[in-house]
A protein has these predicted regions:
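Short, gly/Ser/Thr-rich active-site loops of penicillin-recognizing serine hydrolases
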Residues: 238, 342-363
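A short helix-breaking turn/cap at a secondary-structure junction
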Residues: 69-164, 170, 353-363
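Acyltransferase
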Residues: 152-179, 204-215, 240-261
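Short helix-loop capping/hinge segments that flank enzyme active sites or metal/cofactor-binding pockets
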Residues: 135-144, 193-255, 269-280, 318-319, ...
Length: 363
């Protein structure tokens, strides 16, 4: 696990760096990278992770396994760290879910995990509805494979575009023009506002005061990633509530899309596994995508934020390999509370285009 579950790589001072099982020079992803590697290497029958900004879906995609971010609120997260030990309130955006070598195992795990905790179980029960359809040819699928706001690595895009054609050849209906009515850039920006606004309460008082002073001193024209991070962390309660209202409108746009389509296919992350980067300042990190540097925790999170912001289920599925031999993952975004539909579509997609493959050298 990365320190405080706060990175899209996995390393910490106690246990060192977690390598990708397909290429030790590459990251396993994060923050639940150890769980994804354990599944990929066959060390475990089932793993759990948590996912706020992709921490299940990113390592699952990088390591060639299945991972599911549940609909927000259906798997209890009481006791999760962060927040600080002893925190009772569930963090906004945070979910806990399974990582497995098959979609069937994800479905089984969700039947066991989903439901209220002891405090809420006195009054309600949860029964997830079955998948919307039975076979691939019955599903109506939307696909959003690339976007200028979060460019996708050419080798990964090439593989995902091939997956779309493989699905069509297998009888699936896939619409590559369908969108939920907002831009990826706007969604990513709103995600960051909600994310850093919700995390502010968990910061030590001194650190928060420094960030608030830094935000107040920023010139109005500074729209850099570091400036946005400071403003979002120091935002007022009113601004945070406005962001939450904007999120509700975003959810309504998704709900309308899912009256016409059963699920949306998109990248779980815009690149396959990338080289280790342990540099301490996240705000100064950049990841090259097609030769152009992208902010490490900015636009790169646009794809995991698609489901994450709006409380939707998102399932990462392995769909073969890039031309460089790295696992390629696709994300299936499903309707709210229809987790079994997202998982079922992931199973059908992987059956056609990939599925789990044991890494070389793993006995």
């Amino acid at each position: 696990l990365s320190t405080q579950a706060m990175d899209i790589q996995t390393y910490n001072a106690a246990f060192g760096t977690t390598n990708n099982p397909w290429d030790a020079t590459k990251t396993a992803g994060g923050s639940s990278g150890g769980s994804a590697v354990a599944m990929s290497a066959g060390l475990s029958a089932l793993e759990a992770g948590s996912d706020l900004g992709g921490s299940i879906r990113i390592p699952s995609s990088f390591c060639g396994v299945f991972g599911h971010r549940p609909s927000f609120g259906i798997v209890p997260t009481r006791g999760h760290v962060p927040g600080p030990p002893g925190t009772l309130a569930a963090p906004d955006l945070e979910t806990a879910g399974p990582i497995a070598r098959s979609a069937d195992d994800l479905d089984l795990a969700m039947r066991l995990l989903a439901g209220p905790d002891d405090a809420h179980g006195v009054a309600w029960r949860l029964v997830l509805p079955p998948p919307r359809r039975k076979g691939l040819s019955e599903y109506r699928l939307a696909a959003w494979i690339d976007d200028p706001a979060a460019p996708v690595d050419a080798a990964l895009r090439e593989r995902l575009e091939a997956v779309i054609e493989e699905l069509r050849a297998a009888g699936a209906e896939v619409d590559t023009e369908a969108r939920p009515g907002f831009t990826l850039a706007d969604n990513a920006r709103l995600f960051m506002r909600v994310l850093y606004g919700s995390m502010a309460a968990g910061l030590p008082e001194g650190q928060f005061e420094k960030i608030r002073a830094r935000a107040a001193a920023l010139p109005p024209e500074d729209d850099s990633f570091r400036a946005r991070l400071a403003r979002d962390t120091a935002q007022t309660h009113r601004d945070f509530d406005l962001a939450r209202e904007a999120r509700e409108r975003r959810r309504a746009q998704w709900a309308e899309l899912f009256t016409r389509y059963d699920a949306l296919l998109c990248p779980a992350f815009p690149t396959p596994a990338f080289p280790h980067d342990p540099s301490p300042d996240f705000a100064r990190r950049a990841l090259a995508v097609n030769g152009e540097p992208q902010p490490y925790l900015g636009t790169l999170l646009g794809w995991p934020a698609l489901s994450g912001l709006s409380s939707l289920p998102g399932t990462a599925a392995p769909v073969g390999f890039t031309r460089d031999g790295l696992p390629a993952g696709i994300q299936v975004v499903g309707p709210f509370l229809e987790d079994r539909t997202a998982i079922h579509v992931a199973k059908l997609v992987a059956d056609v285009s990939g599925g789990y493959v044991r890494p070389p050298g793993v006995d």
